[in-house]
Amino acid sequence: MNEKEISEIRRRFRADKSNITHVRGCYINEKQEIVSQFDQPLSLLPQEECENMLSVLRRTLSGTLGKNLIEMPFTTAQVVDSDEHRLLMALRDSKLTDEEAVRMFFEKVIASYRPEGTYLILLANDTYDVPYRAKDGETLEDASENIYNYVLCTVCPVKQTKPVLGYDVPENTFHNRDIDWLVSAPQLGFLFPAFTDRSADIYSAMYYCRSASESYDEFIDAVFNREAPMPAEEQKTTFGTILGDALNDACSLDVVQTVHSRLCGMIEEHKASKDPEPLTITGRTMKTMLTACGVPGEKAEKFEEACAEQFGADAALSPRNLVETKKFEIETPEVQIRVDPEYSEWIETRYIDGAPYILIPAGAGVQVNGVPIAITHPDVEYEEEE
């Protein structure tokens, strides 16, 4: 799925667009016990509550592709004959009316997802009459291409509110508000089947994870029977470690600045092009980039080999997971320097009197702890004011 296809399905989760008739739910306490289950018809909900329910579901299709939204492919063997794929198909094909399939799915999630507090599992089914899209991009609502039948799973923490004072308008007094339980933003979930090339793709699901540092290995293994992908934050850390270890003494400030600048440039160009397909690079691409930066060939080769070992051979990585586009940071054990990436080239390293220094040009407007300071030339003498 690309960004346009994700956006197209996300727009379905509105009262005037959706064909969702009911939502199945399972509420689990901190002891991993089922507190209650429900099958809620949306038509019986007040409009505001219906919109809130759809809003919670819609957020399972939010975030950045490749970071929060990750494609989960199934093998041909899984599609032909596997328990995990058969269960997902049963949920979809029955439109969540297969009680045994729903029960098995809830039990599978409960056994593989163990947060600290209580949480809610939501299941929704929608049937989308996909409108025809002409070559010029214009959508013809009255001309259907195919029917896309899918299920969306959302797992949300349920958190207790804190006791607070509330104002009672009729009585003109303040009272403690009752403690309540509120459904928080989705922590994880998935869409099945994927909406690839604007049609159902039973060979893939779109997995959602709110945190870029969590992987939820057990959940992914239970639902998709595959190894969890490396979280985005771990990808960034691993990439930096590989870069430093492989290049060793060739990993200079100039090299890191250039790599950061070029990856950020690729991200900006991709954004400006409005290409819906995700931007990816490989270890081979990075090897070419490093060679262009002046890194010796054998060290660039070592970097490519380390990438293949850590991420997989020919792994397609998102540059957004490898660099911070809005931050350039330099750290020593005693000092931390943060610079707008646009001005990172102002920083340089230099040996002065045999000691290594990090140099930053200081213009006007320098402050220390909020206090404006003057930086004077050592040869300039102060003139005392009379």
Regions found by a protein language model. Give the residues of each.
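Long, hydrophobic alpha/beta structural blocks
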Residues: 14-326
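C-terminal, beta-strand-rich globular interaction domains
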Residues: 291-386
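Soluble regions of membrane-associated proteins that transit the secretory/organelle pathway
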Residues: 2-7, 31
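Short, isolated positions in well-ordered beta-strands
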Residues: 12, 86-88, 101, 337, ...
